[in-house]
Design a protein with these regions (language model features):
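Cysteine-nucleophile active-site neighborhood
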Residues: 158, 183-260
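Phosphate-binding active sites in nucleotide-utilizing proteins
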Residues: 117, 130-194, 198-203
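Structural motif
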Residues: 14, 133, 177-179, 211, ...
Length: 339
């Protein structure tokens, strides 16, 4: 890992699931061989257990006593790790990189993407903030907080809506963001909400910009096969069906590049895939490449206004993606108001 850490972002080590005695034994070895400080350990705690499902993930609202477990973990970490030293190292790293980047003041822990250039963009665009409707419910709930903050930093106004519980997308929407989640567990409810399916399809057909990742991408298909093997009609924007392959289809980090430039300004964007479901129409607008092994495959449906595919993108790795999407929403806003 250290060989790929070109920005020296790894500044210390905490040994997980080890006893304090083993930690004391390994600390001098690790510090000598790796040149990194060992900041402590986190012993095995039988009382701490997080349930999982087929993707290894359950939502916080599904787990009873989660806050209690988090507090227990925090108390144990305070006992077995040097948190004061960790904070000192983090501040030193931030100061070093602030000077490297030409800043003279120690940066506060700020919202990702809100550097000087982005703030200037936001100030210029405050008078015309396009509304981005973000799907958020039991079916669509996977979002990087950094991504949402960056959308706001570039001038987007986020509003939430539920494809499960509402009849149509928000009237003020200028763009759609359909994130990942577990639509396969809610396939029947999503399918039976015909008015929402029609609302999304008609909005996209009428030119509304949209981004759909993983679960959101699945929802845009003609149909989805649920865990019991039953097919359910979906939004019908993308031809084809999504179905469970019974194994991990693609897993891990990738760099995604476009075949023809639309969203990414000629640069890659970092992404992550982790899914058992697959599509018989994954798209061919982009190429995803594993950073170490170099394994690659085609993916993504895109044009100037739409980006649909399985990869979960990390927007700060290529802010051009956000800039393009927000600008597309702004143009749609103007077009709609001009009618």
């Amino acid at each position: 890992i250290l060989q790929y850490d070109r920005d020296h972002r790894i500044i210390g080590v905490i040994l997980n699931r080890t006893s304090e005695g083993f930690c004391r034994t390994m600390t001098p070895v690790i510090e000598k061989e790796l040149g990194l400080p060992v900041l402590g350990c986190f012993p095995v705690q039988k009382s701490l257990h997080l349930e999982s499902r087929h993707l290894g993930l359950k939502m916080p609202q599904e787990m009873e006593g989660l806050r209690k477990q988090v507090n227990q973990a925090a108390e144990k970490l305070e006992e077995t790790a040097d948190l004061d030293r960790m904070l000192q190292l983090l501040q030193s790293w931030a100061l070093l990189h602030a000077f490297r980047d030409g800043k003279t003041k120690l940066p506060k822990l700020q919202e990702p993407g809100k550097d000087k250039g982005v703030l200037q963009k936001k100030e210029k665009q405050q008078e015309e903030c396009p509304v981005i409707a973000v799907a958020k419910d039991e079916a669509f709930c996977f979002y990087y907080e950094d991504n949402l903050r960056l959308l706001e930093a570039y001038g987007g106004k986020l509003v939430w809506f539920s494809p499960l519980g509402q009849e149509k997308i928000p009237e003020e929407a200028d763009a759609l963001l359909l994130g990942g989640g577990y639509p396969e567990l809610c396939a029947r409810q999503l399918s039976e909400n015909v008015s929402m399916r029609n609302s999304i399809r008609e909005a996209i057909e009428n030119g509304m910009p949209s981004v759909a990742e993983c679960g959101g991408f699945m929802y845009l298909h003609e149909s989805m096969t649920d865990e019991e093997g039953e097919n359910w009609p979906m939004a019908g924007v993308i031809t084809g069906n999504c179905h469970n392959r019974g194994k991990l289809v693609r897993f891990g980090y990738v760099n995604v590049t476009e075949q023809t430039s639309h969203f990414l300004a000629g640069k890659p964007v970092r992404a992550h895939e982790f899914h058992y479901y697959d599509s018989d129409n994954n798209g061919e607008s982009c190429v995803a490449v594993k950073p170490v092994r170099g394994t690659s495959w085609t993916c993504i449906h895109e044009d100037d206004r739409n980006w649909w595919g399985y990869p979960h993108l990390y927007y700060p790795s290529n802010p051009a993606f956000v800039e393009h999407f927000v600008q597309a929403a702004r143009l749609y806003h103007r077009e709609r108001n001009a009618k």
